[in-house]
Amino acid sequence: GQPHEGQPAPQEGEEAEVVEIPEYFTAKRKSVVTYPADLFEKHTWHDGSPMSVADFVMYLILSLDPGTEGSEIYDASQVGKVESFKSSFKGFNITSTDPLVIEYYSDVWYLDAEYNVTDWWPYYDYGEGPWHMMALGVLAETDEELAFSGDKSEALKVEWLSYISGPSLEILRENLDQALEEDYIPYAATLGKFISAEEAADRYNNLLNWYRIQGHFFVNSGPFYLNKVFPVEKTLTLTRYQDYQDPSGKWDLFGTPMIADLEVDGPGRVKSGEEAVFDAYVTFEDAP
């Protein structure tokens, strides 16, 4: 269903709050994004997990839940951000999963057309995030072991969550063990419609193997993955992701600036008041 005014997804074992929804909403902007039909076949996270609809839904949930009172990961420092978002947010609807089609309704619009497209790609403030990676952070913050924000970490006197280094890693590893043992599906009342127990187990095992090899939990899906982290030296290494779906030469077309050549042909002189015709020829590298 479509969320109404950012109602938080019920936690497992809780009854969903009944909210009276108006017969219809109005919105100043409707964005429809259709993803490639083979998105979930070819696009994988760096730990080998295929991307799924659940990654997008988790992103929507975490756009609202931290700043919503009553949430198990409620963060007072996020209230302003969430309330600002909710003031213009009118709806989110997945009309198809094959291919993935996402409708988004909002009262915020822009003069530049490209900014009016909202894709809901799971990209957080610190980069992309698959649902199973984010789930470890949710578990840790729910138990007040770590906090997603610096403000909350100071308020709770706990470590500011880091997926790449520091004391967070041991805590995240413990939560990964818990997730594996319990077949944990975060926000199960909602995400349980998109995640099976088998998929959850596969994802967590992929993340465990990733951690054993890479030594961190930061999983993305771009052309380079975070290989090694050296926090003392403040350096890191990135390595090409061999299974990235786009060929390396996909954007070669834009390697050379397409500066056109213009030639105008017409009479050299024109008498005032008379009609004149000029032909304009626009070429790039001698081609029209």
Where would I find each of the regions flagged by the language model?
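The feature preferentially marks the first beta-strand/turn patch immediately downstream
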Residues: G1-P288
